[in-house]
Design a protein with these regions (language model features):
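C-terminal accessory/tail domains of diverse enzymes
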Residues: 7-19, 42-174
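Histidine-centered divalent-metal-coordination microenvironment in nucleic-acid enzymes
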Residues: 8, 22-41
Length: 174
């Protein structure tokens, strides 16, 4: 990831431009996420892997989103706010692509400020935790949580009160 960023920044500079990979470089536009895709060669293992990651996502958010700026995109402009999963649902912290409903997941909360090696280590640890605890994920969220907030803010709080939220600040993530 570092080499890629260096190449893009160098190429941009040589053309009189500036490339910025920070989580929220412009406050009026959506930010930059760094979605992490995970595949399992045994599809039947993916629900347990996902359950482990969901169980630990709150405590590893500090490492997936390590700067104050990281939290300016969480829950805003298409970045997830809730620790949940859904098939083809971009409003959830974990999205299961419809083309691979059992073998792939996408972690949508992380951003480019994270140390990718540490992020992968923590995600692997969280995924393996299911072996000890026999975790099972909650049912998938079908509702588009971005759209429901825009449509009815009063009812939104009632419908989402049972979802855990991703920490909304660096201090909360600690």
């Amino acid at each position: 990831a570092s080499t890629f960023k260096w190449i893009v920044r160098t190429k941009a500079a040589s053309n009189g431009l500036y490339a910025d990979f920070s989580p929220k470089p412009l406050s009026v536009y959506p930010g930059n996420g760094m979605h992490i895709n995970i595949s399992a060669n045994k599809e039947e293992k993916m629900p347990a892997i996902m359950a482990g990651i969901l169980a630990h996502l709150s405590e590893i958010t500090y490492f997936l989103n390590p700067s104050e700026e990281s939290y300016s995109r969480i829950g805003q402009s298409k970045a997830p706010k809730f620790i949940c999963w859904g098939t083809q649902n971009r409003s959830c912290a974990i999205r299961v692509p419809s083309k691979h409903p059992n073998g792939k997941i996408q972690i949508r909360s992380s951003d480019s400020e994270c140390n990718i090696y540490l992020a992968f280590t923590l995600l692997i640890y969280a995924a393996l935790d299911e072996k000890k605890k026999n975790l099972v994920p909650e049912p998938a969220v079908q509702e588009n949580l971005f759209q429901s907030y825009a449509e009815d803010k009063k009812d939104y709080e009632e419908r989402t009160k049972n979802y855990r939220t991703i920490p909304l600040s660096l201090a909360e993530a600690r």
